[in-house]
Structures are given as C-alpha cells and as structure tokens.
From Swiss-Prot:
GO terms for molecular function: ubiquitin-protein transferase activity. Keywords: Transferase, Ubl conjugation pathway. Pfam families: PUB62-63_C. It catalyses: S-ubiquitinyl-[E2 ubiquitin-conjugating enzyme]-L-cysteine + [acceptor protein]-L-lysine = [E2 ubiquitin-conjugating enzyme]-L-cysteine + N(6)-ubiquitinyl-[acceptor protein]-L-lysine. Residues 166-186 are annotated as: Disordered. This is U-box domain-containing protein 63. It comes from Arabidopsis thaliana. Transmembrane segments: none annotated. Pathway: Protein modification; protein ubiquitination. Functions as an E3 ubiquitin ligase. One of its GO terms (biological process) is protein ubiquitination. The keyword Aminoacyl-tRNA synthetase does not apply. It comes from the Eukaryota. SUPFAM superfamilies: RING/U-box.
Length: 383
C-alpha cells in the first residue's frame, strides 16, 4: 500500500507543471474547472465573484472605502506607469447655508501618450483632466451661500481658492495670505489712532471756521454759529454769516461764554499734555545717554585710589614695609618698569640693584634740596 501511495504521489508531482502551464495559459473569461486533468487537491475553488483572481487582466483595479462620516477616501491605481491618487477630505459644520471647505491633495504621475484607462463618467473624467493640468499642491474650495457671501480665514500658506457659486460656476483665484499680526500691537495702534483722530476732530470743532485758530474769545451770532475775533471781522465785512450766509445786523452778536470755557480747558489740557510729552522725551533721552555714553569725569572702580602715581624714569625713595628687605629702606632708586596693580620694578642708584615693590612702599623725591642732602648723607642701612 505504501508503494502505491508513493507512486500516485510521484504521478501527481509530474502532472503539476502541466497543470500550472494550463493555469497560466487559461483564458481570463472562463472560470477554472476541476475536470481539465488537474488534480483536485491542487485546485482552489472560488465561489465569490468579487474574490475571483484572473491572470493576465491588465485593467485598473479600484478599491473604494466609504466611512459613515463625511470623509471619503478613494484610490485609483493603474499599470504601465499610470498612477492617479486622489485623497479628498470634506469638512461640514452641519449647516447647508454656510460654506463648505474641502481640502484636496492631488498627486498625478501620468506619462504622455498613454491612456489612463479610467472607467468613470464624462464629468469625473473632465474633472480629473482639469486637475491633472494644475500643479501638485493643496486646494481650498469655498462654496458660497445663497446670498453670494464667502469668507475664508487667512493661513500661513498660499492656497488656491475655488469659489463654487450656487449656479455651478467655478472661479479660481490665487490668494497670497499675509502673516498674522500681533493682536496687542494692532489693538494699541487702533486705540492710538482713535485718540488722535478724536483729539483732532475736537480741536477742529473748537476752532474758528475762518481763521482756524482756537476761539478763546468766541462770539455767537443770531443764527447760532460762533466765530472768533478774526472770523467776526470777516462776518462784519460780509454782513452775513460765513457758514450759513444768513444776514446779520451790527451789534447782534453776543459772547459765547460756555464755548470760551471749553476752549480754555482744552488749551490747558493740550499744554499739559505737551509738557508731559516733552518731559517724557527728555527723560527717555537722558536715560539713553546714561546707558550709552559713560561719564568721563567719573573715575572707574579699577582706577580709584592712587595706584599708578609714578612713571618710568622717576626718582623715588624706598620707604618699604614689613616685607621689604631692610637694606633697601631709605635708598634712592629709579622707576624702571611699571607692572600691574601698582607694582614697579625699581633700580637703586648707588649699586644698580633691582627690586619689585608696590606703590605704597615708594615716595617721590621733592624738589627741596635739603631732602636731597639728607638722603645723600644717609649711610647705607646694611652697614
């Protein structure tokens, strides 16, 4: 029995290449059969039509995955170097009247002269051809509402904006977004501009419409318009109001006391503000000067005290201290070298012996001759 089983297994193995050759050369339109001299043990039966594997089919394979939400991912792949990938993500806020923003990433690698073989309808093919002409990048689609309003936020990138109108027309435009400005600086600039404009408008109201000067001596006419001294002269010449051209009589004008009080208060406020501005400007300039320009008259900390009282070539007397050798005390020497931190190398006059001493151990020889004689007659300390 074992011998028969071995022989049957060998025959099956010999028939395997022939079966594989038939399988490869089998037409794609027909389903594989078990009765074509193929061992049933080497045949896999596919009952599901969607899971059928066909050899030699060069058509494109499309896999579509649809989720429950608003996202829809679609992948298209083809042979012969043609590849079209299109990932589309759509975001909706749930309101049909608001615009929908969809960001599409398009990637197209198409060889010229080769048909892509897509099996879509004419509208989808036209959209694919139109998108393949555009450069690879991000596309921001803004759909207008019924009233024709469309607004988009500014981002840090350059987008291609497609505005889809309700009638189906599509208009493309490039929009270079600006960088985000600091909110605090914008708010400060707006407050400053508002205050300046209100101040200027108030000054224009309190000024004479003829001369433009503040109406310190405001006078009101029967028509209700007020003028200063310069404007009142012009009104008397014309015998009519400069603003409304209403005729006026001589002596019909009266002083506008309330307007004079307001102008006086405005002038005081303007003067005080101007004085405060000058003071702040002066303080700021003084502060900059104190930080930038050092005071020349002030001695630095490193040079405080007398650290370098002598110069090279000066004649000095060695006074010495506790660490100075006794034989140098009281002798006349000459400054030879100036060192750091007030140290000097001195050389004695009588025997040219050098020693390094600090400035506090030295004293300058005065011009008094008696001092020189006393020093000259002083015997050496080492004798």
């Amino acid at each position: 029995m074992s011998h028969l089983r071995r022989r049957r297994f060998k025959l099956s193995l010999c028939a395997l290449p022939v079966s594989i050759d038939r399988l490869l050369n089998f037409p794609a339109e027909k389903q594989m059969s078990v009765n074509d001299s193929i061992d049933p043990r080497f045949v896999f039966h596919v009952e599901d039509e969607s899971l059928r594997f066909r050899v030699g089919d060069s058509g494109t394979k499309i896999r579509e995955l649809e989720t429950v939400g608003d996202r829809h991912f679609r992948t298209q792949q083809g042979f012969c170097g043609n590849r079209i990938e299109k990932d589309e993500t759509m975001y909706s806020d749930g309101d049909d009247e608001e615009y929908d923003v969809s960001i599409r990433r398009r990637t197209a690698l198409i060889q010229p002269g080769i048909d892509s073989g897509n099996n879509y309808d004419s509208a989808a093919a036209e959209e694919t051809n139109r998108e393949s002409k555009n450069p690879v990048g991000w596309e921001l689609v803004v759909r207008e509402d019924g009233e024709g309003n469309s607004t988009i936020d500014r981002h840090e990138m350059e987008f291609k904006v497609r505005i889809t109108k309700p009638d189906g027309n599509v208009s493309n435009s490039h929009r270079n977004t600006q960088q985000k400005r600091d909110f605090a600086s914008v708010e400060k600039e707006r407050v400053t501009t508002t205050s300046v404009s209100s101040w200027e408008s108030l000054k224009a109201i309190l000024s004479d419409p003829v001369t433009g000067a503040l109406m310190n001596d405001a006078t009101i006419l029967p028509c209700g318009h007020s003028f200063g001294a310069g404007g009142l002269k012009e009104v008397k010449k014309m015998k009519a109001c400069f603003t409304c051209s209403q005729p006026t009589l001589e002596g019909s004008e009266k002083p506008n006391l309330s307007l004079r009080i307001v102008v006086h208060a405005f002038r005081q406020e303007e003067d005080s503000d101007h004085i405060h501005t000058l003071k702040r400007r002066k303080e700021r300039s003084d502060q900059k000067r104190s930080f930038c320009i050092p005071n020349i008259t002030e001695t630095p900390k490193s040079s405080r005290g007398i650290q370098f009282p002598f110069s090279i070539g000066d004649h000095i007397i060695i006074e010495g201290n506790k660490r100075t050798p006794p034989r140098f005390v009281g002798r006349i020497a000459v400054i030879m070298t100036q060192c750091l931190n007030g140290w000097y190398v001195v050389k004695t006059v009588d025997n040219s012996e050098s020693i390094k001493l600090q400035h506090c151990s030295l004293a300058k020889i005065s011009d008094n001759s008696s001092t020189k004689v006393t020093v000259a007659e002083m015997p050496p300390s080492w004798l």
